[in-house]
Amino acid sequence: MSKVKSITRESWILSTFPEWGSWLNEEIEQEQVAPGTFAMWWLGCTGIWLKSEGGANVCVDFWCGTGKQSHGNPLMKQGHQMQRMAGVKKLQPNLRTTPFVLDPFAIRQIDAVLATHDHNDHIDVNVAAAVMQNCADDVPFIGPKTCVDLWIGWGVPKERCIVVKPGDVVKVKDIEIHALDAFDRTALITLPADQKAAGVLPDGMDDRAVNYLFKTPGGTLYHSGDSHYSNYYAKHGNEHQIDVALGSYGENPRGITDKMTSADILRMGEALNAKVVIPFHHDIWSNFQADPQEIRVLWEMKKDRLKYGFKPFIWQVGGKFTWPLDKDNFEYHYPRGFDDCFTIEPDLPFKSFL
């Protein structure tokens, strides 16, 4: 049979997806984290893989799903949080724009799976299935009550799950995980379709969402999930030493306030007394696409006058950040390769060919 007749849609998908194959899985496994440091990789959206000097591996908000794929239904799902927020009827055109850089089914070494809240782009059934099928049988699933309810509903044993609320601390090898207050007001209006939010006092945030502070021997990482800006960031900054802070950034569409702005990201970094602030989430949705360089420009305008003690860092999905080695860098670039040029004799017609 000729090639063009043997190839199918399914064979095409399997040969190209996930786009990075197991490249990043292998990179993470091979990484030897030096004493006094921690390494992390951006998995897309707010997904992070954190690795400590003691070899602890944890992932947070690793999501392997997608957004809109068809114009079939022109209307938004009834009762969707964005419909509640802005009184809209039209379909939200949120297409996923980020490639899949980590294969969940190639994960073998992992010590904990965490989620900040139960929105679809922060918790994933495929990740849960892959860890249950291929990894150690004692890997815990850690998150607020709504996340644990989802995991259990998917088939993760209850005894493998740990419910956390602000103030709780969980130890995973040499990483101390502190659950802190979340400020995700969108989570509070994520309700069953038949339940009204108007005129009703929202239930507590603590069952729905948490922020995390990861204390490693090499430094600390603050993960804010989908939190909006809050004055309480300053309280967290007063109570904890925070080296690196991650904040959900995006260009909010008209009538919507769901992501922090460039000014909010700077206020967050200042309030937390962080050393480095890194925006994320702006990569994933086509309709919230934002330019993180705006944060850098605004920081340059304000840093001397306001005496900022932090720097912004502009990341790329799939890229690695090592604290404190990268603390003075402003922008990530993927490895460019060719560092071994001219280690063998070039095969060219003549020396000045190129």
Swiss-Prot record:
Induction: Induced by L-ascorbate. Repressed by UlaR.
Assigned EC number: 3.1.1.-
Pfam families membership: Lactamase_B_2 (PF12706)
Record's catalysed reaction(s): L-ascorbate 6-phosphate + H2O = 3-dehydro-L-gulonate 6-phosphate
Cofactor list: a divalent metal cation
Recorded metabolic or biological pathway in which this protein acts: Cofactor degradation; L-ascorbate degradation; D-xylulose 5-phosphate from L-ascorbate: step 1/4
Keyword Protein transport: no
Gene3D superfamilies, sorted: Ribonuclease Z/Hydroxyacylglutathione hydrolase-like
Keyword list, A-Z: Cytoplasm, Hydrolase
Gene Ontology CC entries for this record: cytoplasm
EC top class named in words: hydrolase
Classification via HAMAP family: UlaG
Function per UniProt: Probably catalyzes the hydrolysis of L-ascorbate-6-P into 3-keto-L-gulonate-6-P. Is essential for L-ascorbate utilization under anaerobic conditions.
Assigned protein family: Belongs to the UlaG family.
Protein's name in the database: Probable L-ascorbate-6-phosphate lactonase UlaG
The species this protein was found in: Escherichia coli O45:K1 (strain S88 / ExPEC)
